[in-house]
């Protein structure tokens, strides 16, 4: 990528981040971002496929920091139960802190893009390793189901409409996904 194109892309991300923080992700359109920057829509879409794509890049630095700390959990805690409990607390807090951006990413036109992202793969690998069993198909299924239950929309629904506390949500996930063997590792 040319230097000026790289600078334009960075400027777009910075202005989008600023507008999202000030007015909320859901209140800012791609058109508004282009107008704020004084660029055409073509320029904006040359860098980002859609708003979901832009949101993913806006939050990318935070995702990288999150993953670094997330991986450290396995070094700091030893039982599967502790690792899962602490990792869920950390992940759920990240979802609360970044709800609007994550909802935008997950609601994008290309539903598979999120599941093919490096962030999803890191989460998958983390929990797959935690659930590892002789049945690889079952382990993959279990990991995918956990991550689906951790999607921003499912989490928000449970908290906002079912009125489940965050701690209860975490504990329910621990009960569902860690069998007695996993609790005593």
Swiss-Prot record:
Q: Which GO terms describe its cellular component?
A: protein-DNA complex
UniProt DNA-binding residue ranges: 29-48
Source species = Staphylococcus aureus (strain NCTC 8325 / PS 47)
Q: List the Gene Ontology MF annotations in alphabetical order.
A: DNA binding; DNA-binding transcription factor activity
Keywords tagged on the record: DNA-binding, Transcription, Transcription regulation
- HTH tetR-type domain segment(s): 6-66
Protein's recorded name: HTH-type transcriptional regulator SAOUHSC_02897
Sorted alphabetically, which Pfam families does this protein's record hold? TetR_N
């Amino acid at each position: 990528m040319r230097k000026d194109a790289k600078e334009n892309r960075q400027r777009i991300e910075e202005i989008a981040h600023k507008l999202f923080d000030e007015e909320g992700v859901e209140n800012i359109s791609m058109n508004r971002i282009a107008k704020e920057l004084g660029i055409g829509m073509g320029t904006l879409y040359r860098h980002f496929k859609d708003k979901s794509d832009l949101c993913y890049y806006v939050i990318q630095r935070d995702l990288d920091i999150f993953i670094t700390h997330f991986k450290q959990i396995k070094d700091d805690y030893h039982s599967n139960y502790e690792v899962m409990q602490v990792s869920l607390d950390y992940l759920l807090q990240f979802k609360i802190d970044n709800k609007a951006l994550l909802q935008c990413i997950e609601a994008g036109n290309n539903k598979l893009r999120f599941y093919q992202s490096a962030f999803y793969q890191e989460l998958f690998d983390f929990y797959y390793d935690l659930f590892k069993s002789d049945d690889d198909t079952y382990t993959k299924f279990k990991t995918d189901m956990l991550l689906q239950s951790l999607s921003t929309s499912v989490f928000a629904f449970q908290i906002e409409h079912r009125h489940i506390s965050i701690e209860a949500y975490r504990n329910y996930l621990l009960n569902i996904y860690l069998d007695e063997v996993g609790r005593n590792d």
